[in-house]
Swiss-Prot record:
Gene: psaI
Membrane topology: Single-pass membrane protein
Domain of life: Eukaryota
Transmembrane regions listed in the UniProt entry: 6-26
Keyword Transmembrane: yes
Taxonomic source organism: Liriodendron tulipifera (Tuliptree)
Family per similarity comment: Belongs to the PsaI family.
Protein name in the entry: Photosystem I reaction center subunit VIII
InterPro entries: PSI_PsaI (IPR001302), PSI_PsaI_sf (IPR036357)
Any one Pfam family match given in the protein's UniProt record, by short name: PSI_8
UniProt xrefs under PANTHER family: PHOTOSYSTEM I REACTION CENTER SUBUNIT VIII, PTHR35775
Amino acid sequence: MTDFNLPSIFVPLVGLVFPAIAMASLSLHVQKNKIV
């Protein structure tokens, strides 16, 4: 049961967290480039 529950929770979580981190790092790079 845990094997079925874990991926069910991890997939959407990673699918939301990973793009959020990517967008955050991208926006930080853009801000640094604009300031410099």
